[in-house]
């Protein structure tokens, strides 16, 4: 799904019209605002900036309207830094009449910090600096990737030591587990 689909399909305009028709927006200082405070939020949020540009909030509302119309259960996985944004979006979807309690799950997860040696691998999705998980899997394997990610809860910060994950010795827990599995398998095989 591309954000441009929201514009090209007309869904974004339909959603903005619905928001207006339901009295959920107002104009101020040349911008269009959503009435978040009407639903207990700390402040109202901009949908369309004074220069005419849409905000992420506006397109995210439209995207979630699309998802509510096409899917039974919506699962969003966001970085923990989006905590306030989750509340904002949930409020908007409730205001539009969607069953967020039973159909929308927003999971907030901590970021994984990839480390090589003593240096962190700098990442920023906004600037386009990131290390895709597919590349990590190619480099260290799917077993090691899964293992290291599963050692922490989603709410916990993960320092992912790439060099350790590559090591082929007992310092690397996944290597040790794989080695133990191979030994046990051989013992069982020899019993037959």
Residues of each region from the PLM?
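Alpha-helical recognition segments enriched in aromatics with Gly/Pro capping
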Residues: 1-191
